[in-house]
């Protein structure tokens, strides 16, 4: 395999996409930093390099970088906070307090060591605070919009699919759509997801490496379509998500796609299909230790089809 300097790698991909240095680096660093990187004269922080690679539709595991002690601590805390966000979504109510307290402690440590000009880390802190603190949906939305504009200053809901985003930024936009959904603005949420999915599908060149990225957006979009009573579209998208999960071995959201299809088929009157999918969703949720959603599916199966799962 041919070795290539990181700057050359980034320059080639940038030119392939027809992007200027200014377009690529907006909100992340100055154009002069990109110029120096492409000429091999400077290497920005790992946070910024990862964001640039992701905006180019490239994974960040194709290069190695020496980390300072601060960068290493920041990366470790951010990783643990993200892991706890997943644990919190899966946890039963009785287990959530411990996870929240640990997340708050890690967030406070991260805030203490994060550099003021590290927009990427500051953005992550603001996003986590929006969902962790006791905020109304309106307050959450304000915080998330403030967070996305730290690195995408010209962000606008009407032109999402024309932007250029890192994985963190697409996760943020996904969160913005989720809050609109919670507020009852289903059409707004669906339009955000539609644009975001279009962006992900057109920009992520290697689905095998970024399957989780596609599945996250597709999963939440399918839920919003169902809430908007667009059941056939929801099933179609959930089936695509299911196929991607199986084909690329990304199973975190697999039971979610199964349960979305189950409920839609039940609403559409296809009870046999719904029953089979509910059972599959339940046992996959149990296998990945997602007790919260396993209980939810168990209840839906009883409420909708008067069937019980004996464990």
Task: Label the predicted regions.
Residues 47-63:
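DNA major-groove recognition helix of helix-turn-helix/homeodomain DNA-binding modules
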Residues 1-16:
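A short, Lys/Arg-rich alpha-helix, primarily the initiator
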Residues 17, 134-136, 183, 228, ...:
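Structural motif corresponding to the intra-repeat A-B loop/turn of tetratricopeptide repeats
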Residues 89-109, 134-155, 186-199, 229-239, ...:
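Helix-turn-helix repeat elements of alpha-solenoid scaffolds
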Residues 17-36:
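Short alpha-helical DNA-recognition segment
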Residues 108-121, 149-166, 199-211, 246-251:
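Flexible helix-coil transition and linker loops at the boundaries of alpha-helical arrays
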